[in-house]
Amino acid sequence: MAVISKVTYSLYDQKEINATDIIISHIKNDDDIGTVKDGRLGAMDGALCKTCGKTELECFGHWGKVSIYKTHIVKPEFISEIIRLLNHICIHCGLLRSREPYSDDINLKELSVHALRRLKDKILSKKKSCWNSECMQPYQKITFSKKKVCFVNKLDDINVPNSLIYQKLISIHEKFWPLLEIHQYPANLFYTDYFPIPPLIIRPAISFWIDSIPKETNELTYLLGMIVKNCNLNADEQVIQKAVIEYDDIKIISNNTTSINLSYITSGKNNMIRSYIVARRKDQTARSVIGPSTSITVNEVGMPTYIRNTLTEKIFVNAFTVDKVKQLLASNQVKFYFNKRLNQLTRIRQGKFIKNKIHLLPGDWVEVAVQEYTSIIFGRQPSLHRYNVIASSIRATEGDTIKISPGIANSQNADFDGDEEWMILEQNPKAVVEQSILMYPTTLLKHDIHGAPVYGSIQDEIVAAYSLFRIQDLCLDEVLNILGKYGREFDPKGKCKFSGKDIYTYLIGEKINYPGLLKDGEIIANDVDSNFVVAMRHLSLAGLLSDHKSNVEGINFIIKSSYVFKRYLSIYGFGVTFKDLRPNSTFTNKLEAINVEKIELIKEAYAKYLKDVRDGKIVPLSKALEADYLESMLSNLTNLNIREIEEHMRQTLIDDPDNNLLKMAKAGYKVNPTELMYILGTYGQQRIDGEPAETRVLGRVLPYYLPDSKDPEGRGYILNSLTKGLTGSQYYFSMLVARSQSTDIVCETSRTGTLARKIIKKMEDMVVDGYGQVVIGNTLIKYAANYTKILGSVCKPVDLIYPDESMTWYLEISALWNKIKQGFVYSQKQKLAKKTLAPFNFLVFVKPTTEDNAIKVKDLYDMIHNVIDDVREKYFFTVSNIDFMEYIFLTHLNPSRIRITKETAITIFEKFYEKLNYTLGGGTPIGIISAQVLSEKFTQQALSSFHTTEKSGAVKQKLGFNEFNNLTNLSKNKTEIITLVSDDISKLQSVKINFEFVCLGELNPDITLRKETDRYVVDIIVNRLYIKRAEITELVVEYMIERFISFSVIVKEWGMETFIEDEDNIRFTIYLNFVEPEELNLSKFMMVLPGAANKGKISKFKIPISDYTGYNDFNQTKKLNKMTVELMNLKELGSFDLENVNVYPGVWNTYDIFGIEAARGYLCEAMLNTYGEGFDYLYQPCDLLASLLCASYEPESVNKFKFGAASTLKRATFGDNKALLNAALHKKSEPINDNSSCHFFSKVPNIGTGYYKYFIDLGLLMRMERKLSDKISSQKIKEIEETEDF
């Protein structure tokens, strides 16, 4: 099949519809001939096509037609286009509406775009009547009536026949088409002689069962039958038009219907493009429950017998395979034989006669049951990233379940509690070769962004790794027994006694070094914990090995170590019993006694406070502050439990060093003090969305407690531990949380999946070009992919070493730091980066040496400097800043830290060039990789408990999925959270006083009303402590009351006095007369007074000012004050003195003030912050997404393709069902370059692996060279001028 490079969309014209000779004229008929189910319309359900004689797979269907007897039927989706054109012509004479007469000798094709636009404004008039002297009729507005199902004159609702509209539109001369934006013959908007009947292939039957009898129906076939029926009856135009609209898109005439029609099956989640083209059901697939197997390696997958006997693989007949095929036929192993000459597939069964069908010529193939070691793709859904779908070698295993190695369970998010996986056996030999390289676990070992291995030990293996390292005094036989099948090459080197460390050295098998961890392949750390053996850890031994050599060595270590750990467990055993957790009841009894005592003290103190408030001895705290104090007391109780448990663990380790539970804790597998607290101490406060359960009827959650009870246990504090067991009420509270969490998980899975799909659609066409830049089509997004132009899985986070006077080259390092430090002090100066990105893991090549053998200090500096200068020019074209790389090499290879030989230095920089040259290739789909990593992480996060940054009633800057969703949707006209930071608290206080919402009711006033002879008197007594607590003054309270009364329309006359009652209280007395009806208005006034007398912006949030330590540099901190406030616009801050106050606005305010580049920076950091701590490695994908959203002049939402030239097919697969209609209407022509279009037309997309194909635009290189030479020459001239001036 030829490669399609361009596609043009247009509407079928009537000649094409008339050209088919399959006439449909019956509603029902024997054998369905002449009906809408006619066998000539294509092959269906195993029957051959009666037109071309081909099968379902080969026949694309044939169109039929039904006569509509010269009736003019409008194509329903283009009704709005016809109305648009009618608004530009006179319905009476057919001439264009114009302000003045126009001549027909204008050549519109010669006009420029601007001239054409001016002419449009001039001609397309808004006048009331026609300029044509022979017509002079008033212009009529034509609309489409849903009720009558035809065009009508809006003025008098009289029908306008379709034939009249047809005549007027086709009479518009072709030369005026550009003026009206007509792209093809207007007759194509109508059906005239015949209506087309689509092939059977686009209307597959929907099966359902009634009384266990299968029925088949198809809504489209029924609707087409109705059109044929009406045409046969020669029905009125409106009747046929209605039938056509019901078939095409019923929503045009009826809003509240969900019946299936053409529009329905081409839009929404289950549209035909997504269901049948982008992805569809396949054969040669299997699905089963998964289980673990200890006998298979990471690169293998165990397949049960019944799947192996069902799936078949092809063997093509050629000179190399013909003998093997004959053997298979002779041994009766062939299931199918395909004869290419006869185009015939034969099923081979016992006793079946197959004479003269088998020729075994090149091109034929046989299908046999799938064999061991064949590559098969398998995966677990949901497939959140590419490690969920991999291709491994098949191994025969017993039982009925698919078996996987436990080492890959983490990467597939699989556990063995009934999870299922699917598998597909690809038939095309090219596909098999491709998958066996690109999807092989060895290829995928390291995470695309994080750089750590995605495979590693799980569960018991982690404990085995810890215990094995600590074992001592092993004889050779014991070592060989532990090593099992890998022990044959073990060299004792004359030793009689061995330790676990020796076994690790043998397993590592390379002379590898890593600071503080490895020396010449020997582990120098104190213990081997989970960080060394599990997946997604930078200290993983498998990762360090693959950084040092290749992924093959990394995978080999995982396979060998996993085998050895399992053997260790089977020999020495490991088990945890309840006795390990709780040898006796002494400790739990002690903890319980402490908890009961403390909770009683808390209750007592709280009850005393409530009594004193009731008796008027003290002024109550605000509700938020009261809840905070209670929460902090309960938190102290929780912390006390954790401290007691930590001490207990420490003591147990001294008394019983072989306690298996504590071994697990030390190994970093399960059981931390918090988990132990739930089991042994107290189950703690139950929260829903981060808050204790809300009180309901009678001021309580459950009827176990008294009405309006303030008991902490009545709000979900569970005192019992799980060992003791929960009481009824405690169980209800724990289930209350479980209910809300399970609801959240169901809803969040759907929401995160939707956003993930949008982000992937948005980013899928973002690839790396031949120069290591990130592009979409011809648009440059980033100068340097991954900042290093090296594959993301090769880059490595390393410690950021700050300048120190003890360092060699201190001045140079310090100068570099001053240039780059802004990037490492972030999040409003609250955080200082601890890690930075190294271009590759060069630390595994750093081998310490003595002072005598070390490279000279100056030589090393010159080498680093020369390499960076060379890389800057040759690889980054001096366009990108790579100072961070120079800083890393200068600090990590600093002679004050470590001395290395010249050979080591040369090795490091040779490896550096190797990574630059060979890892990141043209076509690397960096967009999809980044989108998947972001999506996978926010999905995980949305399903775990959410967290926020602020407490105490302030506006919460939410972390997690919700905030990420808001940032990517980029909704306008919403309030934004503005942060103000200053070292001068008074500047923030003036903003706070003006903006913070305080109403009279919050000050707990004592309001009394009395009536005097000619007026009402209202006394408001307020305790001054409340005024102070609200951080306002008595004058502000007076102003609040005064302002409310003066603006009140129900007050006729008023006066006000302020009195100081005593040292604690102040009284505001108001004298009032109301407008009629006086009683009613008095009631209204008294009802709204506590809330309506207020100041500030109405908001449920307070505006507290908090202080924090801000970083100016790694060694310079400053006390700063911070305040967050919700504002619509920064103009509201215009009247304040904000000199030396840092204002951090939201994304739209940032864009409005500082422009698109600042908005990009803001979006990147804001998206990264939603992930919380420990996700710094997501900076690169966040930056890439932010750069894409801000690639044009204005930030663009992930929901839209407003700026990018997104293809019609991309829009259609994204869910825009109007995309194809608009493309056809405007006769669009588009190249097939993007992912969606390539998928649709079976073209290989221009994305690759970075292994084989480079796309280099030589023109770009020449332009770049010219620019660089111009830049260098102008620099030289400047230098000469400066020298002359000197």
Curated annotation (Swiss-Prot):
It is found in: Virion. Its EC number is 2.7.7.6. The gene is OPG105. One of its GO terms (cellular component) is virion component. Belongs to the poxviridae DNA-directed RNA polymerase 147 kDa subunit family. It holds the Pfam family RNA_pol_Rpb1_3. GO terms for biological process: DNA-templated transcription. One of its GO terms (molecular function) is DNA binding. This is DNA-directed RNA polymerase 147 kDa polypeptide. The DNA-dependent RNA polymerase used for intermediate and late genes expression consists of eight subunits Rpo30/OPG66, Rpo7/OPG90, Rpo22/OPG103, Rpo147/OPG105, Rpo18/OPG119, Rpo19/OPG131, Rpo132/OPG151 and Rpo35/OPG156. The same holoenzyme, with the addition of the transcription-specificity factor OPG109, is used for early gene expression. Keywords: DNA-directed RNA polymerase, Nucleotidyltransferase, Transcription, Transferase, Virion. It catalyses: RNA(n) + a ribonucleoside 5'-triphosphate = RNA(n+1) + diphosphate. InterPro entries: DNA-dir_RpoC_beta_prime, RNA_pol_asu, RNA_pol_N, RNA_pol_Rpb1_1, RNA_pol_Rpb1_3, RNA_pol_Rpb1_4, RNA_pol_Rpb1_5, RNA_pol_Rpb1_clamp_domain.
